[in-house]
């Protein structure tokens, strides 16, 4: 029988190898101004992101591998964020915009892409309603309030946000794989099956424009991730058992649970709280990704061709702007040999994927089937 010390050494080695192989990002080692966010240190942000998957963190602590994992994540963060900041700087220069410009200068830029970027930034910083782990959006109450911000500062914020939202959940997947290869069991984890592709697509097609009455439709905000979660549930992804089912309706901020329970005794307070007990992982773009990414293979890219090569009907695709968070979830579908997407808000059924590529600048695919 192998000793615990040998097991711990093997876990550390596997984690290191998997993380290094998984996260090499090309790019020059150029640092954007003020890479850290104004509210928390980078270390605190990473800790917060990891806390979203407490069972994995607890397992690493039990095996005395958590510090090694944190060190690897921190090292990867420096490389990844700087490379991403360099890429974003090149994107801006391709629009004829200097990174030293302010947000307000984008409004009158000659390139339409730069003017679109202005609108995207406003949506990110002013219209964003979800909690953020990087920025306190409440300080930005109008477009005018952000027009004096340096683009170089936003580049750093956006790169760090992407690392927290996208890369950290992916790193946790490799940590889980390493722990499981060494026989560590997670008795409270749900089963993570390969989902039923046909069931996902059939559900998406059936309710793309005719909403399922079993689920409440929000009167404000987006229904896109709520719709995707419904399709995944139809495809065989089990809801996490919750103690609040039927007794304490409301929206629970969590990425360790995934559920939507009707609860007739609810009092209307927000669109998602009325007659519903729901997790944010069911209804928020970022939280759904954080919930799924440690357990399913993912692809992240800004290259349309790379995205196309990784599409499959039934997969989840998420899109976002050049600067800012991912903001839309859809189900990949196919029609007449062309890749399409089916979604809510706006309601689309088998809309050509080229429109998705035109609307967004970066993409994530979750391979659930």
Regions found by a protein language model. Give the residues of each.
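Bacterial N-terminal signal peptides that target proteins for export
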Residues: 2-11
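Bacterial N-terminal signal peptides
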Residues: 12-22
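Sec-dependent signal peptide cleavage junction
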Residues: 21-37
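Active-site-adjacent structural elements in enzyme catalytic domains
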Residues: 41, 45-235, 239, 245-247, ...
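Glycine-rich, aromatic-bearing surface loops/beta-hairpins
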Residues: 98, 105, 112, 132, ...
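Solvent-exposed loop/turn segments at secondary-structure junctions
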Residues: 210-211, 234, 238, 317-325, ...
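Extended boundary segments
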Residues: 215-217, 226-280
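...with weaker cross-activation on analogous glycine-rich loops/strands in unrelated enzymes
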Residues: 254-341
């Amino acid at each position: 029988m192998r000793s615990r010390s040998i097991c711990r050494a093997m876990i550390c080695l596997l984690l290191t190898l998997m993380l290094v192989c998984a996260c090499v990002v090309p790019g020059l080692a150029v640092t954007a101004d003020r890479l850290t966010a104004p509210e928390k240190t980078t270390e605190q942000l990473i800790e917060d992101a990891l806390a979203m998957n407490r069972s994995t963190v607890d397992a690493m602590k039990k095996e005395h591998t958590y510090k090694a994992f944190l060190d690897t994540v921190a090292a990867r963060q420096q490389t990844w964020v700087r490379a991403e900041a360099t890429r974003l700087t090149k994107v801006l220069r391709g629009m004829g915009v200097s990174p030293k410009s302010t947000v307000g200068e984008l409004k009158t830029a000659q390139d339409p892409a730069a003017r679109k970027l202005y609108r995207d930034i406003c949506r990110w910083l002013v219209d964003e309603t979800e909690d953020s782990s990087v920025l306190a959006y409440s300080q930005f109450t109008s477009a005018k309030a952000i027009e004096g911000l340096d683009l170089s500062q936003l580049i750093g914020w956006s790169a760090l946000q992407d690392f927290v939202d996208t890369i950290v959940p992916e790193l946790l997947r490799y940590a889980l794989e390493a722990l499981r290869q060494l026989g560590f069991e997670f008795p409270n984890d749900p089963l993570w099956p390969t989902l039923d592709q046909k069931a996902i697509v059939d559900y998406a097609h059936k309710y793309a424009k005719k909403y399922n009455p079993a689920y409440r439709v929000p009167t404000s905000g987006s229904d896109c991730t709520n719709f995707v979660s419904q399709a995944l549930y139809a495809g065989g992804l089990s809801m996490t058992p919750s103690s609040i089912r039927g007794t304490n309706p409301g929206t629970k901020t969590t990425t360790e649970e995934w559920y939507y329970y009707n609860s007739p005794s609810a009092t209307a307070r927000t669109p998602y709280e009325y007659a519903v007990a729901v997790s944010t992982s069911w209804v928020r773009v970022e939280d759904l990704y954080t919930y799924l990414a440690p357990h399913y293979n993912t692809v992240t890219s800004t290259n349309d061709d790379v995205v196309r090569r990784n599409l499959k009907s039934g997969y989840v695709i998420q899109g976002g702007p050049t600067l800012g968070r991912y903001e839309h979830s859809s189900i990949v579908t196919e029609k007449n040999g062309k890749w399409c997407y089916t979604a809510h808000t706006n309601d689309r059924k088998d809309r050509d994927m080229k429109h998705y590529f035109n609307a967004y600048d970066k993409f994530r695919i979750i391979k659930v089937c």
